[in-house]
């Protein structure tokens, strides 16, 4: 057999092996959950359609666990769960994340290593728990009337949003932690509501649009990025409808002028201006 033909066959074989290797790339989530002997630990993908169980394990006395799954092409979200206790995990490509916690306080007290995004998500989760505690304290205060409760709750929510926008979302809109922040919730009167309201708050819609634009640049055609675009666009439509109704109540309808959609501009990773 000619040497050139041997080299050709070898090159094809290496290319095939490379393709298989790329398709088999995995991420790993390992660690320990103490005080949880005989409890079932679930590893779930937080898909756009809701939680999907990927794997589970019945914990021994030492609480050790190890999960691995196919690496996603864009940042994806998972969670470790025992009953109602949850630890949120973000995975970007072939990361190896290590988590240590104790049941039943794993949701608020855990250590995470190997992922900057997971560390920031932990920070956001703890901030969210503190926010909920503050809201509950205001609602349950015997010294506040209905109007005062509403005003104080609105104030702490606005302060929270401004802090998260400044220190997480607008700072790094392409990060998984920024996406995660958009979908944090708070319980108000037994109703779970999004902290950032994408339906009728034009300032919050701008936040969704900023992350959507950034994801479109860094993770083109990613399902989550496309979903953010849809949320932002629907929110813009709702705001225009509300504004139009308000204007009709205030002035002659013949004088109403409909403006265009909110214009969001961000520089992409190449320095080019991108708009939603």
Question: In which residue ranges do the predicted regions lie?
Answer:
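N-proximal helix/coil linker or "cap" segments that precede and/or mark the start of modular domains
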Residues: 207-274
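Amphipathic alpha-helical repeat scaffolds of TPR domains
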Residues: 173-194
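A non-transmembrane, solvent-exposed segment enriched in polar/low-complexity residues
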Residues: 22-171
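Bacterial N-terminal signal peptides that target proteins for export
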Residues: 1-10
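C-terminal motif of bacterial Sec signal peptides marking the signal peptidase cleavage site
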Residues: 17-21
């Amino acid at each position: 057999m000619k040497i050139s033909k041997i080299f050709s066959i070898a090159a094809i074989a290496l290319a095939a092996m490379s393709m298989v290797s790329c398709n088999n790339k995995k991420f790993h989530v390992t660690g320990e959950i103490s005080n949880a002997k005989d409890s079932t630990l679930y590893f779930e993908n937080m898909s756009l359609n809701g939680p999907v169980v990927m794997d589970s394990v019945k914990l021994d006395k030492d609480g050790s666990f190890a999960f691995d799954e196919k690496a996603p092409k864009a940042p994806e979200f998972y969670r470790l769960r025992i009953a109602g206790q949850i630890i949120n995990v973000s995975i970007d490509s072939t990361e190896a994340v290590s988590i240590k916690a104790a049941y039943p306080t794993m949701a608020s007290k855990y250590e995470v290593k190997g992922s900057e995004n997971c560390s920031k998500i932990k920070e956001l989760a703890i901030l969210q728990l503190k926010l909920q505690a503050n809201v509950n304290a205001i609602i349950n205060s015997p010294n506040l009337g209905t109007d005062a409760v509403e005003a104080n709750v609105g104030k702490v929510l606005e302060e929270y949003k401004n802090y998260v926008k400044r220190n997480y979302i607008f700072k790094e809109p392409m990060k998984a932690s920024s996406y995660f922040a958009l979908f944090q919730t708070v319980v108000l009167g037994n109703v779970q509501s999004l902290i950032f309201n994408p339906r009728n708050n034009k300032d919050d819609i701008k936040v969704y649009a900023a992350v959507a634009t950034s994801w479109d640049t860094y993770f083109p055609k990613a399902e989550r990025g496309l979903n953010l675009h849809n949320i932002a666009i629907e929110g813009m439509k709702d705001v225009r409808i509300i504004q139009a109704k308000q204007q009709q109540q205030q002035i002659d309808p013949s004088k109403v002028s409909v403006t265009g959609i909110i214009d969001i501009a961000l520089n992409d990773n190449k320095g080019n201006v991108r708009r939603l």
